[in-house]
Amino acid sequence: MNTDTEEGIFSEQWRSTTIAVMAAIGIVAYNNLAVSAALPEVGNDLGDVALLPWTISVELLTSGVAMLAVGPLIDSVGARRIFRVGVIGFILTSVLCAFAPSMLALVGARALQGVFAGLVMTVVMAAVGILYPPQTRAKVFAANATVWGVTSVAGPTIAAGLVSTVGWQGIFLMNVPVAVIAAVLAWNKMPDSDEHAERSSLDGRGIALVTAITAAALATAQGSLTLIAVGVVVTLIAAGLYIPHERRSAHPVVRITHIMSPKFRNVHLTSALVVGAGIGVHAFLPIYLRGARGLSIAAAAFSIVWMSTAWSMSAFTASRLQRRYPPEPIIFGASINAFCGTIAITLSVSAEVPIWMLFVSLFWAGSGIGAISTTGVVMLQSRVNLNEMGRINAAHQFLRTVGITYGVGLAGVIIFTTVDRRTGNVETVRELLGGEDSAVNQPVIDALAAGYSYTTFAAVLAMALAIRSARALVRDRVEPVPSAG
């Protein structure tokens, strides 16, 4: 669908399409950043603090499954119709989230929201591969990184203002005008179906099995021996059923080769480890700063700006480096950078250094994560034909999302299990989030700080594993597919 051209992405040929893609990215960017900023106030208002991690994890879980499910449909029915369904659903579920009367209701609304967020994100990533020639894609991802960069500053600023004035509900309601603007700009700009494309049916059985595998695997990270045992058994059974199903199905929800093939698996693994570890630390930063370090609601909400800004800046820088260097060494260098930055975060939290030093460490780690995130997608798109673009993007986004889900889930378990075991009641965190910092709460403060410290150490281990898989990319370099453009 694309043609080779050296024109810029904001030339007359590409301008409207590029703006549409950037607008669609803006939906997901604002939502992801703002929700993390609101966690302390959500926990204080709704209670059931132990469920807080699920307000993020369940959205990631359902968005990941939606990404997989929609990949083959993009290749057959086109991205335009799927984008329209996704953006309308996202608007409606944002309203549901805003008016959730309890933590459990919010978790349910977030599960629905994740489905539609997954549709939008997969469409955007696939559209870049379909619409733009290979030499232009890095520029588009750089433009997308700019959106993330603007949102990384504007999002926390808006979130901090909303949380401290109208409450956490305002964050979800703010999704509505953002999504409406994106819908207007991108409504007719996403690629339509190719009349020669092979038609795919929805793989209902495959979706059910993948959902079971993902949910059961996530259950093993929840700390309970019963859940671990059940999760392992269900994961093995569902995986055993999916393998023969994939071989028999003409249009499986995900092809195993798109995950396990040597030319794909280390890209998936590196990205999932780095992004999952980084967001696991990032998601609970406002809770740590509000509860353990005593920052105000607004200041804690704004704290997420540092890692997300560095993430966006490094994604832009990496896209420029790709014009001169192969992607493999860029990812390897970025993985080392992310590892060193995460060590700095761990030391900053453990030693309780001044807050500004922690922010510098977060910025450092984010600079490595962002480079890997963007470069990995460009690398994958160069390794497949156009008729596989939707599937490979869906598989990658799904695995990244699984990594993030595990990162957030494990971080939540580590933090709140530490608090529960040291104080006997995890709900005591709610008092800290409400601003009660009396001497009676000192054991809770210490437990929350310790739990977050353990979380950062787990992130260091994940970053170390990512260096190994990134090194394998350099060692086993794969040449781009000529027909990828």
Segments the model singles out, each with a brief description of its role:
Residues 89-96, 178-185, 237-241, 337-347, ...:
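Transmembrane-helix signature of multi-pass solute transporters
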Residues 164-176, 221-228, 417-459:
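A membrane-interface helix-boundary motif in multi-pass transporters
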Residues 164-270, 277:
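Hydrophobic transmembrane-helix bundles of small-molecule transporters
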Residues 28, 56-59, 63, 90, ...:
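Structural signature of transmembrane alpha-helices in multi-pass secondary transporters
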Residues 1-13, 434-442, 470-485:
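Intrinsic disorder in cytosolic terminal tails and internal cytosolic loops
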Residues 37, 67-204:
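Helix-loop-helix hairpins in multi-pass membrane proteins, especially solute transporters
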Residues 14-31, 35-37, 50, 58, ...:
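12-transmembrane solute porter fold
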